[in-house]
Amino acid sequence: MKNNNYNPKKIEKYVQKYWVKKKIFFTKIDKEKKKFYCLPMLPYPSGKLHMGHVRNYTISDVISRFHRMLGKNVLQPIGWDSFGLPAEETAIKNNISPKKWTFKNIKTMKKQLQSLGFSYDWNKEITTCNPEYYRWEQLFFIKLFKKKLIYKKKSIVNWCEKDKTVLANEQVQKGVCWRCGTKIKLRKISQWFIKIKKYADKFLKDLKLLKKWPKEVISMQKNWIGKSKGLKIKCKIYKKKYFLKIFTTKPETIMGISFFAISMYHPLINLFLRKNIEIQKFLKKNKYSINTEFQKSNILFGINTHLYVIHPINKKKIPLWISNYVKYNYATGAIMSVPCSNKIDYNFSKLYNIPFIKIFSKKNKKLLINSDNFNNLNIKKARNKISNFLINKKIAKKYIYYKIQDWCISRQRYWGTPIPIVIDNKKNIITVPKKKLPVILPKYIYKKKSLQSLSLYSLWLKTKISGKKVTRETDTLDTFMESSWYYARYTNPKYEKDIIDPKASEYWLPVDQYIGGIEHAVMHLIYFRFYHKLLYDFGYVQSKEPVKKLICQGMVIIDSFYKYNKDGSKKWLSISKIEINRDSKGKIISAIEKSSQKKIIYAGKIKMSKSKNNGIDPVNIIKQYGADSLRLFIMFAAPINISLEWNSKNIIGMHRFLKKIWNFVFIIIKKKKEKIKKIDLNKNKKTYIYKLNTIIKKVTYNIQERNSFNTAIAEIIKFFNYLVKLYKIYNIKKKNLIFCISTIIKMLYPFTPHICFILWKKIYGKKSCIEKETWPKFNKKFFLKEKNNIIIQINGKKKDIMKIHAIISKKEIIKLILKNEKIKKHLYKKIIKKTIYIPNKVINFVL
């Protein structure tokens, strides 16, 4: 490294080799140190990284390096979520086995991750399609099966025609497949389920433990679990021996029922309506479309059964309908319809001319009318009186229902974890003995244009258990199973005695910091929490939740374009194949495909992904500007929780900044020990040392407390520019310059580790190593006299101003304010729901 010019390519290669050689980031249990487990969501090996990956993994690496500098024992592992349908689809297209394609991609992506300088413990790398990983998943499946937490039954499931497989409810988004966008149909087939619903109450209760999770994720999980308290009411079917059971959360509206409605899968249909030709035609046409039409565009349809249900209170005959908006898999699959209280009921009754009455007063919408003995009662009193009446008459019971359903975990695919189950000649289900694990996939046989399931592998299907001829289960596990427990296996992936090493899990878990997109809030993060609770119940982990703190980073978005294929499907085009026309303000007005010169469609700025063909290869950026410039740009361009608009031109500014630092360090190194001129005043020294302490304080706070990395970088750049300007005006002592620039290098190190590694050695010699340095501490004495005027607000209204020391924390500030007599009066017997604090400026108590 003799050349004094900034050459990122040369520097980064050298530094990365050093890290590997010295095993800098390998971790082990060290009880003398405080641990910090930082985990980015593991990638699917799709072929190449794009900037969305780079953002996720850079955030994780910056946090990991920062906490190492705080003296903690940091674990930051990486692995590969390597089962999945894309591998099978590629296998068909390219006549290659899914395994070969997957491992080829892993090799490519691993090289890319290493080129970005991420401080992973590669000794703990996991590949989920490796039998050495999934054997433990198979063993846990058997344990769950024996505890009756896993079961198989014939059930109505979501079916994707394109992918030829079942989907869990969480994987159906607005009636279409979450992966390929195909419209979902329903099928009744035998499937494996895991009892996630049994844990619904624990899910909700333990959300309060997730104090450092985004509120949006907490809210999404609450809604997905969907706890509803209400009444389960028995209603007699007119001239039949049977009852219709309905569930309602609004018993006060019962006097306004104008019709009852059941789902297209309700058991009453088979009991009474099998021979009704009109109904059978209706069901044949609509039964397998679930309520996707309603979900997507609020299209309502139904049919009158010409059966009647007796109203449980006034004994009137109420018509019974079958409708697409009644969910077959929620509560009883039957509802009481009150058009004056429910918009969907109202629209349905208007569509089919079903008469209804109003039960709420025009003058006071909270008072009941047309409700017999319950007239003039308000909603609360009516609810209590009607509920008590129905319960006392033994017509109803208090009931709780959950929206969340048991997790369907079986898939009709080849490339997945084989389910460790066999079936004997008497149709008995038998678990594969532990000594026979792992059950390994058969060697892949290429079949043109055909997605495969294990049922095609006849030789593999037939086996023997304890000398008995048996047939293997042909379904594989949902790939979300692998990604639901990998974090625990990371703690010691080479452990051979059990699913998880108890010593390693006790030391490292729970995860201190988890990083991934908000799109995982109700799929991966639900399963992730669920699996941890299972592991907790089996004694494998000690904490009730898997993760203390969650960051949901925003997407990296970019201008994206497509055209339509002959079959009507979209073909997404790479930006390199497009000519773009912009107006004077830079707005895109049209785009043309270079090869055909035909107009194409601009889709706007959307998430970078392989499926949209809009990814920017980080390798090209690294070649041109270096990994440090890319890392710094990714962390500076936008706050981490919002979308980052990609623009390759903006990275140039970060590259120039690093070049300036590089050159300035060499200027300082060459500087002689000069006599101090009169112009170098003591008060000037105090100014820049004070400013440096201010910057250390701000940068530390922005990284540690706020995860505001962009503002932390802005503060570092601001101080560096100030230092350069000062250097040009004043003759500052060399030791003071070195102190200042060394502090800047330390603070930049988590963001740009390669350049900082080299500059540290240039300043302090070959034997020095920045990895052994600690995070700079600010000197409190510079702030003890400094006070800020803090505006105190309650519900956004100013109540007082207090002078408070700049150095103290938010918690200490709140303690001081709550002792203020003026504020005490306003907060007396009030509950503070939320506290909003803008450092050194405003604090707002929301009541």
UniProtKB/Swiss-Prot annotation:
GO cellular component annotations of the record: cytosol
Gene Ontology terms describing biological process: leucyl-tRNA aminoacylation
Pfam families: Anticodon_1, tRNA-synt_1, tRNA-synt_1_2, tRNA-synt_1g
Molecular-function GO term, any one: leucine-tRNA ligase activity
Database matches in SUPFAM superfamilies: Anticodon-binding domain of a subclass of class I aminoacyl-tRNA synthetases, Nucleotidylyl transferase, ValRS/IleRS/LeuRS editing domain
Extent of motif 'KMSKS' region: 607-611
Motif ('HIGH' region): 43-53
Keyword Cytoplasm in record: yes
Keywords for the protein's UniProt record, in alphabetical order: Aminoacyl-tRNA synthetase, ATP-binding, Cytoplasm, Ligase, Nucleotide-binding, Protein biosynthesis
Entry EC number(s): 6.1.1.4
Catalytic activity: tRNA(Leu) + L-leucine + ATP = L-leucyl-tRNA(Leu) + AMP + diphosphate
Transmembrane segments: none
Localisation: Cytoplasm
Main EC class the enzyme belongs to: ligase
Binding annotation for ATP: 610
Family in the record: Belongs to the class-I aminoacyl-tRNA synthetase family.
Name this protein carries in UniProt: Leucine--tRNA ligase
Gene name in the database record: leuS
